[in-house]
């Protein structure tokens, strides 16, 4: 399993916009983890 983004706050680095980690096809985010759909 892979971690998804927690909150925007934790993803921010300095003045860069936050980027949310996406799950790939066939997976979805659930409880901050990528799970099979």
UniProtKB/Swiss-Prot annotation:
Disulfide bonds: 4-18, 8-29, 23-34
Subcellular location: Secreted
Entry superkingdom: Eukaryota
Main localization (coarse): secreted
InterPro entries named among the record's database cross-references: Hwtx-2-like
Pfam family, one: Toxin_20
One GO term describing the cellular component: host cell postsynaptic membrane
Keywords: Disulfide bond, Neurotoxin, Postsynaptic neurotoxin, Secreted, Toxin
MF-aspect GO terms: toxin activity
Family matches, as PROSITE patterns: HWTX_2
Tissue-wise expression: Expressed by the venom gland.
Function per UniProt: Lethal neurotoxin that blocks neuromuscular transmission. Acts cooperatively to potentiate the activity of huwentoxin-I.
Summary of subunit composition and partner proteins: Form 1 and form 2 may dimerize.
Family statement drawn from the similarity comment of this UniProt entry: Belongs to the neurotoxin 12 (Hwtx-2) family. 02 (Hwtx-2) subfamily.
Protein name: U1-theraphotoxin-Hs1b
Highest classification ranks of the organism: Eukaryota, Metazoa, Ecdysozoa, Arthropoda, Chelicerata
């Amino acid at each position: 399993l892979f971690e998804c983004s927690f909150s925007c706050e934790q993803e921010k680095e300095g003045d860069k916009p936050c980027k949310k980690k996406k799950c790939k096809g066939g997976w979805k985010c659930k409880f901050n983890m990528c799970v099979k759909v």
